[in-house]
């Protein structure tokens, strides 16, 4: 198949067009006075949001070269969202600034590889500076402010999330659900979470959030690999007779067995989801036994003497609700006997006291927390479906920011921490084109503050100049238009979010700066159609593969 190519400055310019198109659409949402974007949906009402990653997901450009640039910046937003769940707009703004400054330096004759090396050597210095100035979350008011700021300064969301986190503590789990009411409420229920998710995307029940949510399921627990239909059929028959969905938590499910389960979901004859069992090696059976006690079931394994062909109803666990994503699983309302759970926790606490290795103690702490933890469910409502979706996105952003703050502390917010981080760069001794890479980072650090001020109706450049000379931690309050101590005014950002945004942006910018060739499929026939050997013009008007994220 023929390809279309662009080289050198032409390739970089076309890629930069895509970077700018996506970043310009996203950065207007930055800050407490950021604007909204309205996104068309082919079915249902449009979505109104100021969530950076949600906007980025919707952007595809007609020019395939520019579209590649847009998709790379989309990767910045997606990666940041995947790591911390917030900070996507900041990451996009930083990436655009680094690409702009870096490409300008390359076009002026700088060696792109040395510029890249300068960026890669500078960013860790900035991260360590931010880490050294971060402080632990000290009170519920800090949690409330972090959540409110991440939700576009919505105090109601801040109050709800702070209440949820206080209920469950640092080791607890907080989830969100849509509600039929107009407001928001917090329900605290018994629950368990572990870090493995579903094995097949065909089993999701909510394609928009890519989650599989099953109410009142039966749960099979096994450390075996299931491949054959006859191995899973007895369990399926039990679930079918009970008219309940099935969750399979196993080492792996593949082959005909997986095809049978996926087919049941696709034809809506049997709802099920396969989740990879937690733990590794010899610890897997132990962690499955923890789940069996909590869920009121049994582990199907050689050690227990129960075979997959002998599974009956009493061998299966159950719960009120199970939610699985690609990376983790949350079980709400496990139905095991509390006296057995208490006995299991006591047994694990004895093992922890006898453990001599820190790693073993950490794993036992996690298992104890999993069995004793609670789950807070934030129920979010709205007057219309559009308002509900917009509020859900802000609640999820705020929840992610709060978790990040609890995990790694907070820094001064409103773009202040990044804008003042340039002070440590004078000590970074680089020469030649590597020094240019350092200056690329230096100039990009002030870009989030510039756009926060601009979106609030102020001259961004003037604000950046003033904040650069203020004492450390003092910055610009975009709501009042005044300068002050960011911590005292409650304008704070999670360190983990700020770090993830900077590192993701620098990674993509360094790749774009060193690009010399861009290759896309040649457009033939109708715009958007592609040619395939032996098939001719495929699906006239079909979206190009390069446009699909």
UniProtKB/Swiss-Prot annotation:
NCBIfam families: GroEL, PRK00013.1, PRK12849.1, PRK12850.1, PRK12851.1. Pfam families: Cpn60_TCP1. It is found in: Cytoplasm. GO terms for cellular component: cytoplasm. GO terms for biological process: protein refolding. The lineage of its organism: Bacteria, Bacillati, Actinomycetota, Actinomycetes, Mycobacteriales. This is Chaperonin-like protein MimG. Plays an essential role in the productive folding of MimA and MimC, and thus in the formation of the active MimABCD complex. GO terms for molecular function: ATP binding; ATP-dependent protein folding chaperone. SUPFAM superfamilies: GroEL apical domain-like (SSF52029), GroEL equatorial domain-like (SSF48592), GroEL-intermediate domain like (SSF54849). It comes from the Bacteria. Belongs to the chaperonin (HSP60) family. Keywords: Chaperone, Cytoplasm.
């Amino acid at each position: 198949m023929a390809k279309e190519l662009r080289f050198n400055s032409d390739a970089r310019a076309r890629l930069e067009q895509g970077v700018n198109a996506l970043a310009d659409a996203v950065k207007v949402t930055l800050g407490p006075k950021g604007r909204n974007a309205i996104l068309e949906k082919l079915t249902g009402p449009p979505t109104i949001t100021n969530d950076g990653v949600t906007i980025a997901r919707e952007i595809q450009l007609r020019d395939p070269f520019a579209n590649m640039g847009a998709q790379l910046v989309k990767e910045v937003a997606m990666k940041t969202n995947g790591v911390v769940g917030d900070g996507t707009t900041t990451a996009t703004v930083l990436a655009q600034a680094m690409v702009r400054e870096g490409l300008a330096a390359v076009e002026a004759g700088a060696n792109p590889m040395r510029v890249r090396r300068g960026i890669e050597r500078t960013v860790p210095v900035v991260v360590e500076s931010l880490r050294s100035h971060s402080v632990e979350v000290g009170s519920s008011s800090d949690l409330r402010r972090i959540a409110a700021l991440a939700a576009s300064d919505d105090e109601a969301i801040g109050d709800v999330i702070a209440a949820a986190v206080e209920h469950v503590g640092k080791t607890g789990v907080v989830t969100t659900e849509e509600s039929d009411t107009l407001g928001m409420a917090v329900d605290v229920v018994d629950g368990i979470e572990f870090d493995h998710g579903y094995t097949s995307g065909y089993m999701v029940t909510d394609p928009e959030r890519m989650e599989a949510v099953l109410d009142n399921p039966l749960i099979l627990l096994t450390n075996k690999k299931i491949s054959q239909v006859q191995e899973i059929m007895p369990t399926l028959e039990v679930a079918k007779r009970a008219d309940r969905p099935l969750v399979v938590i196993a080492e792996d499910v593949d082959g005909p067995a997986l095809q049978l389960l996926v087919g049941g979901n696709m034809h809506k004859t049997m709802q099920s989801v396969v989740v990879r069992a937690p733990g590794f090696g010899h610890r897997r059976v132990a962690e499955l036994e923890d789940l069996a006690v909590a869920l009121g079931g049994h582990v199907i394994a050689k050690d227990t003497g129960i075979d997959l062909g002998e599974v009956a109803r009493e061998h299966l666990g159950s719960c009120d609700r199970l939610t699985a994503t690609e990376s983790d699983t949350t079980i709400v309302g496990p139905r095991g006997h509390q006296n057995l759970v208490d006995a299991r926790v006591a047994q694990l606490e004895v093992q922890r006291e006898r453990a001599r290795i820190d790693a073993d103690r950490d794993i036992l702490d996690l298992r104890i927390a999993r069995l004793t933890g609670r789950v807070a469910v934030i129920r979010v409502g709205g007057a219309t479906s559009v308002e509900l979706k917009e509020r859900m996105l802000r609640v999820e952003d705020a929840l992610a920011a709060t978790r990040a703050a609890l995990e790694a502390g907070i820094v001064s917010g409103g773009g202040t921490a990044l804008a003042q981080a340039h002070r440590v760069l004078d000590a970074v001794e680089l020469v030649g084109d590597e020094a240019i890479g350092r200056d690329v980072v230096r100039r990009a650090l002030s870009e989030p503050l510039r756009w926060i001020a601009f979106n609030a109706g102020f001259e961004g450049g003037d604000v950046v100049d003033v904040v650069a000379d203020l004492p450390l931690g003092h910055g610009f309050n975009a709501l009042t238009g005044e300068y002050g101590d960011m911590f005292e005014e409650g304008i704070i950002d999670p360190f983990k979010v700020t770090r993830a945004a900077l590192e993701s942006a620098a990674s993509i910018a360094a790749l774009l700066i060193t690009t010399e060739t861009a290759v896309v499929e040649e457009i033939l026939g109708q715009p958007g159609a592609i040619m395939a050997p032996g098939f001719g013009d495929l699906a006239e008007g079909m979206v190009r593969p390069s446009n699909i994220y």
